[in-house]
Amino acid sequence: MLQDIMNTKKIKLHDCHFGSPLCDPSPAPHLLSSAAAAGLSFHPGLVSSAAQHQQHGAGGWLHEEYYAPRSSPPSSLLAQTCVGSNATAFYAAENLPQFDFPALGTAAAAAAKAPFRSSESELYRPVDPLLLRADHSVRTYYVRPQKRDSGERTPLPPPSQQQHQDRIHGLFAGAPTTRLLSGEPKIHLFPPQVAAKPILPAMDAPSLQNQMENQLTRNCIGAATPVTPTGNLAGSGAPSKTRIRWTQDLHERFVDCVNQLGGADKATPKGILKLMNSDGLTIYHIKSHLQKYRIAKYMPASSEGKQLEKRATGNDMQNLDPKTGMQITEALRVQLDVQRRLHEQLEIQRNLQLRIEEQGKRLQKMFEDQLKASRSVMEPQELDDVVAFAAGDGDDDAFDDVDVQLLAVAGSGYDDAGFQSKIS
């Protein structure tokens, strides 16, 4: 039973929860007496803590602002959170009149039907810092039951304080974006006695809160700035380039304007734009189209043919299988070898032809020199031959006469010798 009572007084508080109620661990005196009458017993440490609280007073405890619930949660939900006890025992031990427990009396049931309002003085509850754990993830606090009259209607907090409370609730109610973008400062409300004392470790989470707020601010700012198609921010004022399609009619007008201005070399984008006078065209469109027009006009046809041939050859090579490709490579290698040998033979023939020509020139020169030498030798000999021939004509006549006479003498002498010829 003691374990059940202790379990009902434990509340787990996480660092990220800012507005959880923190209460004084000292139980109310009338609860101690009522619990003793009912047969319940409290832990000695809890009773000593209550006595210490009565001696020192409530001014020495740290406080944290919280908001009392206006509507009671379902009894089944709270009963499930209390380990080892039912809902009736939990409500009776804590003296919470906003929940129904008719088994303990009709006065508490009547108080549960009345609307619950927390006064300004009840917004702060003392907490014993010595009972806080060193662990920053989960902390356990001992809650003191609240003492109030069943039929008393407490006044609502002042409007200004209610506005501050609603504003702080808005910080953690899922709408931090509007507050951060509007530039509203962060507000933390604490009672005056908290300012002079060290803050609880559970409340020392503004650093985590600031990180979350900064991240939300960056996300909101990044989502609120649209980006243009050119990559510039919408508020930068940079002109966005629109794309147009150059139809045949538009291109013909462009060519006419270029010809009027003296050709593609002399035409300027500004002059073409002025002559065309077409809606939607800008100087950037004219510059780009004029550059393409110049490139297409002055590109050599041979280079285009070579490019087309190379592309066709590349496509054909891609369509061939590896075996055929190897055969073609081998044939090309053989052809290169033949061409190399032909080139070597042509070079040898050329060198031989040059040598033959040089030798012919030398022979021609030798013949000319020989003719000159022979002419110089033959001229005096010819003169001698002419003189000798002229002198030899007279001698021949004398020799002829002598020969005739000798023949005559010989003939007569033969006849006289008695050798007569026999003629039949």
Curated annotation (Swiss-Prot):
A motif (LHEQLE) lies at residues 342-347. Residues 269-294 bind DNA. The keyword Protein biosynthesis does not apply. Keywords: Activator, Brassinosteroid biosynthesis, Brassinosteroid signaling pathway, Coiled coil, DNA-binding, Lipid biosynthesis, Lipid metabolism, Nucleus, Steroid biosynthesis, Transcription, Transcription regulation. Residues 342-391 form a coiled coil. GO terms for cellular component: nucleus. One of its GO terms (biological process) is brassinosteroid mediated signaling pathway. Residues 144-165 are annotated as: Disordered. One of its GO terms (molecular function) is DNA binding. It is found in: Nucleus. Residues 238-298 form the HTH myb-type domain. InterPro entries: Homeodomain-like_sf, Myb_CC_LHEQLE, Myb_dom, Myb_dom_plants, PHR1-like, SANT/Myb. Transcription factor binding to specific DNA sequences of target genes promoters, such as the motif R1BS 5'-NAKATNCN-3' and the motif P1BS 5'-GNATATNC-3' to trigger their expression. Nitrate-induced component involved in modulating phosphate (Pi) response and homeostasis together with PHR2; activates directly the expression of Pi starvation-induced (PSI) genes upon nitrate disponibility, thus triggering the nitrate-induced phosphate response (NIPR) promoting Pi uptake activity. Homodimer. Interacts with PHR2 in the nucleus. Interacts with SPX1 and SPX2 in the nucleus; these interactions prevent binding to the promoters of target genes, thus regulating negatively leaf inclination in response to phosphate (Pi) starvation. Belongs to the MYB-CC family. This is Myb family transcription factor RLI1. It comes from Oryza sativa subsp. indica.
